[in-house]
Amino acid sequence: MTEQIKVEMIQDGNFLAKEFFSQQWQLYQKVLKNNYMGHREIYHVLHELLVKHWQKPFTMLELGCGDASFTTQALLNTQIAEYTGIDVSVPALENANKNSVVNGCQGNFITGDCWQLTKELAQDEQQKFDVVFTSFALHHLQVEEKEDVIKNVQNLLKPGGFFILIDVVRQENEDRDSYVQRYLGNVKKDWSLITPEEYKMMDNHISSSDFPETQSKLKNISQKVGFRDFECVYRDDLDTTQLLCFYR
């Protein structure tokens, strides 16, 4: 194979990757705009939780922050003093930086794999936060990886701090295949503006990349790694999404 052909193949691959990311991003924005995953309700609960628990200035680390648009809204009129966001996407972090300005707090943005960086930050005694937060991301990991992340998060928290997890969660007696079919059934029934092509993208993504745990499994992990308490603060009407708090 000539070097020219190799270069052309790499360029074609990069173009296809960017095109695929663009399609996924557009679909995600449609999901957010139409509130198909209930972001408005759950981030309202997040806002109320932060107002209730933090009447003094607090710091937050968000893992996989994306453009932080919903987090920014949840932080309005709270005592947030410093926000740190980690994401693999440079364009998303640039938007997150712009979005976070409205909160008037110090903003720090780190490019990289949030799970790997969580491990590295946990080894630094100077890196401690009042709140660590992640939304619709942890379920992409296998159970052993989830446990490692939650253990590292526990080490990142100041005494009295807590880890807030927004994510999809399986019902207690539901296996993964049943969860996938139930979730996709809800998508087909309720996500009325999704095209057949977009539904196929959702099907491919969920079937290949979603590995949600049950609430009891997450509670067991929280106890195993040393959290003192665990609470389900919110559960959506479809029983697919929860907001969980792990208290240090």
List each model region and its residues:
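N-terminal, positively charged/glycine-rich alpha-helical extensions of SAM-dependent methyltransferases
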Residues: 1-27
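C-terminal alpha-helical "lid/dimerization" subdomain adjacent to the S-adenosyl-L-methionine
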Residues: 166-223
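Class I SAM-dependent methyltransferase SAM/SAH-binding core
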Residues: 61, 69-71, 75-117
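Core SAM-dependent methyltransferase catalytic element
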Residues: 226-248
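Conserved S-adenosyl-L-methionine
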Residues: 64
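A short glycine-rich, Lys/Arg-flanked "PGG" loop and its adjoining helix->strand segment in the class I
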Residues: 147-159
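Conserved alpha-helix/loop element of class I SAM-dependent methyltransferases that forms part
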Residues: 38-56
